[in-house]
Each structure stands twice: as C-alpha cells, then as structure tokens.
UniProtKB/Swiss-Prot annotation:
This is Protein DVU_0531. It is found in: Cytoplasm. Keywords: 4Fe-4S, Cytoplasm, Electron transport, Iron, Iron-sulfur, Metal-binding, Repeat, Transport. [4Fe-4S] cluster 2 binds at residues 73, 121, 123-124. It comes from Nitratidesulfovibrio vulgaris (strain ATCC 29579 / DSM 644 / CCUG 34227 / NCIMB 8303 / VKM B-1760 / Hildenborough).
Length: 461
C-alpha cells in the first residue's frame, strides 16, 4: 500500500485532517496502515543527499565502537545492559544502515528504526558528553527522526502533535481567543488575594515578554496565574503576546522540521512586533531548546541568536531572588528533604545548573543532590516525546527506574522539577512505583514562601 488514509507521508495541515486522525483512537488504523506503508526509496535517498552534511557523515565514520557511550545511557542500564541498547549500535544499525544502503530499505526496517528512534533514545545526549570523539548522538537521532517522519513512520501522537502546531500554532487546540480569555479569567480570579494584578497582553516595549507551554492555558491555567503573581511580586514590567505565546514544539520530537520553523517564527514575530527588552520562557526544557537554542537556526538566523535576549524561567527566578525582587521568608523555606531534577535540555545542553542550585539555596533547608547530578544527571525517563507515546508506554515505564533509584537514594520526599516533561515523568514514576514522593514546579513553591510587599497585600476589612 503506497499510503494510507491516516498513515502517509503528508503532514497534517487542516483542522479536518487533524480531527479525523484524533478520531482514530489510539492510532489503531494508523498503525495498521503503517505496517503496509511503502518506503519511497528514491525520495528518501534524495532527502539524505540534500540534508546529510559532512558532520553527520564524519560522526558515523569515526565512531570507534569503544563502548564509552554504553553505561552513560540509562536505557542501556535498565535493559540489562543489552548490547543492542548501546547508543553507538542503535544509531549505526538505523541511520548508519539507511545511509550505507543509499535509502534502499523496506517497511520492516523503517518500523524497526521508528521503534529505536522513539523508544530507545530520548535525545538527552548524555552519551555524547562521554564520547571521546564528541559525537552528538542526540543530533543524529533527531536527524533519523526527521527521515522517518518524511516517510510517514512516526508515532501517532507525534503526528497529531506536529499537526496541532501547523493548524493551531500550538501543541494543543488553544486558539488566540481561548488564550486571551484565559489571561483575563486568571487575572480576575486573583483580584481578591492580589489586588491590582494584571496579565498584560500585547504591551509594546515591556521589560519582559513571557511565553509558555500550551498545556498551561489548556489544562493548568493556575500556572499562568502563578507566573503573573511572581511577576507582580517582583514588580516587573511584563506582557504576553496574543499571538506567538506558545514556545513548545512537539514538531521537534516528531522530526517535522518545517513545522518547527513555522512554530518558532510565530514567537519571533511576536518579539519583533512587541519589542520587549528580553523574553522569559516557562518551566520547560524542550520548549527552551526549541525556541532559544535550535530556534534561531530553524528561523534562518545565522548568528544563532534570538531576536531579543532570552532567559529560561530558572534564570529569571535566580535573578529575582539574587537582586531581592523576590524575598523569601526564612520560616517558610522547605524543611523536608528535597531534591532537584536536572532537565537535559537546559542543564546538560545549555549549562544552567548554577541557576537551579542558586534557587535551591534560597528555598530549601535540606537540599539533597541526586547522584550523578547537574550536566551528568540522567534523563527523567520520558524526554524526547517518550512520555506521550502510548505504543511505547511499557518501555517508558521501565525507563523510569533509573530516576526512581536516584530519588530513593537521596531520601527526599519532594522533587523539584522545573520542566513539563520531567514533571510528567516523575508524576508517572510515583503512580507506577509508589515510592512516596511529591513533585512540584518552582512557581507554587516560591509563592508560598515569598514575602509579600505591604503595598501588594489586600486591604483588611
């Protein structure tokens, strides 16, 4: 079968097609069609010839098969050190083989490659940190995902996710009207406790333009309110854009590079329109990577810089605490043992470990590091889209064991997880293994312990 009704090589560009795909519960028909989806070998090889640059070719050639990447991979470790889980083997037996065969691979090969690309690697790039040749396995697996996506071999949930970005400009069906109404609603809800609090929309020349994850207005609107409360306490001159507010990119997980470009260009257009002094992104790892690290290159910015200076939320919080914009009541600091999850995308891959430790020094009396930690920490177990793929849930749950054991070794009762994927993985970890922990973003914790300036307190009756 050349292409199916649901599983095909075409991106999802219309609301009608998106709703039809969503109606295929669990991707039942989608995956059935995938088993018969023919590989367009000529198009695959033409794609490789056009996009596979010297760096990727060199990495594939210089791998010495030394095995240094093996123990660095948490999936290798939790799968009984199966040699087929060694990162070098995983990439050589998939991407390397596609290139060696000049694209002449069949459906069964692509089905296998899809499973490896999305259930045996989260693109955390911990292995790349230990490679003596500096091979960036995360980049190579991302490239493999792009090739698979172009041929229609992509998990159902991620085909939907990239379609959401194409159709709605967000990873979920949140329209501009929905978003602006959520901002108004959340501001109104806070008036009694936080008089004067606003969520300003489309204010030009603000000091901060805040962007976030579509899950927040869709499922966790209180997160939008919490961000507003902390900006309010800090006295920030800030705004959100009515368009270009969504900074995440499920398209990046899917390997839909055209949708990645579309998504980040919406955010950058908002920056150009509103001209803020800087941008602050929410507590999300992959969103930061998509908008602040990879984004400039997708959007054609050759210098690799965003249109305005960009801060991850942990950078802004650390600055606000350091400068006294937000002050912590010592009596309200976290007293119980607490540990911290390091998001791969902004700790290992963007060097922000000092910011998160600085924050913990202000808010925790008994902070306990995981072992290993900082840039050496392990992936939460659900990154790179792994959390959301039902087909690979069994493998994902097994992958959570490494993080489970790290947390247990600290004796912590609370895990601070300033990243949506990490937050989800640790929530699921507790549901699966029942180890008796709680987990939290930074925002609600800091609000509970912040000293509220007198002029921001509600008048006593």
């Amino acid at each position: 079968m050349p292409e199916g009704k649901f599983c095909n090589r075409k991106p999802v560009n219309t609301e009608e097609d998106l709703k039809a795909l969503l109606g295929d519960k669990g991707g039942a028909q989608y995956y059935k069609e995938m088993e018969e989806l023919e590989v367009d070998q000529e198009a695959l090889w033409a794609n490789i010839e056009k996009t596979c640059q010297s760096r990727t070719k060199t990495w594939l050639e210089i791998c010495a098969h030394c095995g240094m990447c093996a123990d660095s991979c948490f999936l290798y470790r939790v799968n009984d050190r199966d040699p087929k889980q060694v990162p070098a083997y995983k990439i050589q037996s998939t991407l390397g083989e596609i290139i060696r065969r000049k694209g002449k691979v069949d459906t069964q090969f692509m089905l296998h490659a899809m499973e490896v690309a999305w259930s045996q690697c989260t693109c955390c790039n911990r292995c790349g940190q230990y490679c003596p040749h500096g091979i960036d396995m995360g980049v190579m697996f991302s490239y493999l995902r792009g090739l698979l996506y172009s041929q229609g071999f992509v998990p159902w949930e991620l085909k939907i996710g990239s379609g959401m970005h194409r159709v709605y400009g967000a990873q979920m069906d949140v329209t501009t009207e929905d978003w602006v109404e959520t901002c108004e609603w959340m501001a109104e809800e806070q008036q009694e406790e936080w008089p004067g609090l606003e969520i300003p929309v489309d204010v030009e020349n603000a000091d901060i333009m805040y962007v976030l994850n579509a899950r927040e207005p869709k499922h966790y609107p209180e997160d939008v309110a919490e961000a507003a409360i902390l900006f309010h306490i800090a006295g920030e001159n800030w705004t959100v854009p009515s368009e270009g507010w969504e900074q995440t990119s499920l398209a990046m997980f899917a390997g839909d590079w055209a949708a990645c470009k579309m998504q980040v260009e919406r955010v950058y257009a908002a920056i150009e329109r509103l001209k803020p002094k800087c941008v602050v992104g929410t507590e999300c790892g992959h969103a930061h990577r998509a908008s602040a690290i990879e984004g400039p290159y997708w959007a054609g910015y050759e210098d690799g810089k965003t249109p305005a200076p960009w801060l991850h939320y942990v950078e802004w919080v650390a600055m606000a605490l350091r400068t006294g914009k937000i002050k912590i009541d010592p009596e309200k600091r976290i007293k119980e043992p607490v540990t911290l999850q390091d998001s791969c995308n902004y700790i290992r891959n963007h060097g922000l470990a000092k910011c998160t430790r600085e924050i913990m020094s202000y808010i925790a009396d008994d902070f306990r590091e995981m072992t290993p930690n900082r840039e050496h920490n392990y992936c939460c177990g659900g990154g790179g889209g792994f959390n959301g793929i039902g087909k690979f849930r069994k493998q994902r749950n097994k992958a959570l064991q490494t993080k489970r054991d790290q947390i247990l070794a600290t004796g912590a009762k609370l895990v601070v997880a300033p990243c949506h994927n990490c937050w989800d993985a640790i929530r699921d970890l507790e549901e699966e293994y029942r180890i008796g922990i709680r987990w939290s973003f930074l925002k609600p914790l800091i609000i509970k312990m912040a000293i509220i300036p007198e002029h921001l307190r509600p008048e006593e009756e």
